[in-house]
Amino acid sequence: VRRRGRGGKQFRAITVGKIAPAKYPNFRLNEHHLGTIVDIVHERGRDAPLVKASFDDEYYYIPAPEGIAVGDRLEMGLGAAATARNILALESIPEGTTICNIEKNAGDGGKLIKSAGSSALVFSHGIEGVTVKFPSGKKLTVNPKCRAMIGIIAGAGRKEKPFLKAGTKAKYMQAHGRLYPTVRGIAQAAVYHPHGGGRHQHVGRQSSVGRTTPPGRKVGIISPRKTGRSRLKERK
């Protein structure tokens, strides 16, 4: 963790192959704009494809929703229809609608639900704002002026394809700025990891630790409700 905080090259995402920030055009909410999909591109380090959209003779890159194709039209702003691929303010989207690329703060261009195959649900409209339900079950109330795209981010099922080779996964992790490979704790020496040491491939001691355990020793099963066979039955 301390090495990662320094920000060495092996922990930073590579900028080679990056195209542009994937966010909405900074148009006013009271304006209506009609865009055309010019191209669908892949950006290194990003699982979901991007669409190159033309608005008012300017090009913008937006995360691609499912079912979109080159030549399709998409609407944005006031008066846009609440149909797939269109970008509207949350206050204009009916409850129960599937949405993606949601703004956390009005005008930030989209910060939530941008990964491949992800989507959220417009749960309710209230006085404090619009409540959005995420795939994890968590609910978040955001500003009704925040924009979102109707639909599901394209690229679902990407994780179903196996890497097959360690080199393929190494290139993937490098593009995402992640350290690879990681050595198992029980395979390390005792001076490097609490689970290390001994001529055996098991922990050799209790692996559950408390919630307030200091860093460096906080490894294994952290603050479990149960341990042993009863815990395995619950997981099944």
Question: Model-flagged regions — what are they?
Answer:
Residues V1-A48, A69-K236:
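Basic, glycine/proline-rich low-complexity segments that contact nucleic acids
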Residues L50-S54, Y61, E75:
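Short, conserved beta-strand segments within well-ordered enzyme catalytic domains
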Residues F55, A64, S124:
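Conserved strand-loop elements at the edges of beta-sheets that form or border functional pockets
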Residues F55-E58, P135-G137:
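Glycine-centered tight beta-turn/hairpin loop motif at sheet-sheet or coil-to-beta transitions
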